[in-house]
Amino acid sequence: MSRRVVRQSKFRHVFGQAAKADQAYEDIRVSKVTWDSSFCAVNPKFLAIIVEAGGGGAFIVLPLAKTGRVDKNYPLVTGHTAPVLDIDWCPHNDNVIASASDDTTIMVWQIPDYTPMRNITEPIITLEGHSKRVGILSWHPTARNVLLSAGGDNVIIIWNVGTGEVLLSLDDMHPDVIHSVCWNSNGSLLATTCKDKTLRIIDPRKGQVVAEQARPHEGARPLRAVFTADGKLLSTGFSRMSERQLALWDPNNFEEPVALQEMDTSNGVLLPFYDPDSSIVYLCGKGDSSIRYFEITDEPPFVHYLNTFSSKEPQRGMGFMPKRGLDVSKCEIARFYKLHERKCEPIIMTVPRKSDLFQDDLYPDTPGPEPALEADEWLSGQDAEPVLISLRDGYVPPKHRELRVTKRNILDVRPPSGPRRSQSASDAPLSQQHTLETLLEEIKALRERVQAQEQRITALENMLCELVDGTD
């Protein structure tokens, strides 16, 4: 299996290791909803997990440092009236997360740096435009406040979250349920997979399918696809005999795959997590207890098997940390957050190196939190690659930044071509007032808690004095 190429790779010795028990997150009731999303999203500040909740949908957000047992009364993010199906952190604001639900809505939330005293129930904005459940979310990689959603109505909507407007609605390109959507590196193209077995490349601003492959995989199970750094596509699917496959495609020649890897026979859909800095793709299947990883190169045979991380427990979902959230001092090149039935376990991928110096070859400049474009610039046809940062001195997440939703002058906005959207939550120049009220409530609750603790301390001191007096 191309042993010569793998042997020369700097990633040939990459190994995975589960974090110690005290670094896991325990007693989390992970959602049991049947849906092929990762159920987990992570960034350098927070870990978010879709959880079981009565009376609607919810997810929990934990600071990364809050490991160990999670209190059963820990505040949740609630507001959806049906199960949450997907969550995605904004790449340009580590305190903003979007959630999609079976209730047909998308909600965008501001997460405070401090631990809230009660459930977070008020989103910054609610986006309504789909007629059926919304199961896929993806933020634009370079444009500020641009969010994509895909629903069971076979429609893709691209929103400007900063104004609540529909920028684009792609409603006639998929005849059946959409299984996955992925942006390319500069957000000029989309790759989609659909229940009709077709892999499509779409120019969303032109509203055109620019290339397609009718049956990239012969099997009946769902497909997934992601762009590589050089514009090729990686797809996962099934053979006619139900063997799981990984294929590499050149969009300029969609007739045959550039490379095809066949693996085991299993029902679990393979979720591909691609790292453009190392050109490694990690394959995680729901129900699997392993993570396979391959290096993608521009020399035959193009897809090189590296190794498999195996554990005893099957995974219910998986989160993938952005490169800026890794520990470069330990030569960590990837970190996953594996969901079990009632816990989340970090899994660290490391390249063994003897030197303690910064490893330039492992850590090229990587996308940072600053957007390269505004939403209007992207919509007008501009493209820009991500704004890169160096990890040489490590990465420190910026302080809390509030997402402001502004309502435009109706006379300055052309009627949207896509579905209409709810104004209920976006009529929020009141957001500042709401933030102030929330902070005042938090301060009041903290004062009450301090007062109660002071009373408890006084009572304990009195009891101690009585015990001391009784022994004298």
Swiss-Prot record:
UniProt-listed InterPro entries: Coronin, DUF1899, WD40/YVTN_repeat-like_dom_sf, WD40_repeat_CS, WD40_repeat_dom_sf, WD40_rpt
UniProt-listed GO biological process terms: actin filament organization; cell migration
Segments for region (Disordered): 407-433
Molecular functions per Gene Ontology: actin filament binding
UniProt-listed SUPFAM superfamilies: WD40 repeat-like
Biased composition (Polar residues): 420-433
Acetylation recorded as keyword: no
Keywords: Coiled coil, Repeat, WD repeat
Entry coiled-coil feature ranges: 430-464
Mapped WD repeat ranges: 23-64, 72-111, 122-161, 165-204, 210-251, 256-296
A Pfam family that the UniProt record links to this protein: WD40
PANTHER family the UniProt entry points to: CORONIN (PTHR10856), CORONIN-6 (PTHR10856:SF23)
Protein name: Coronin-6
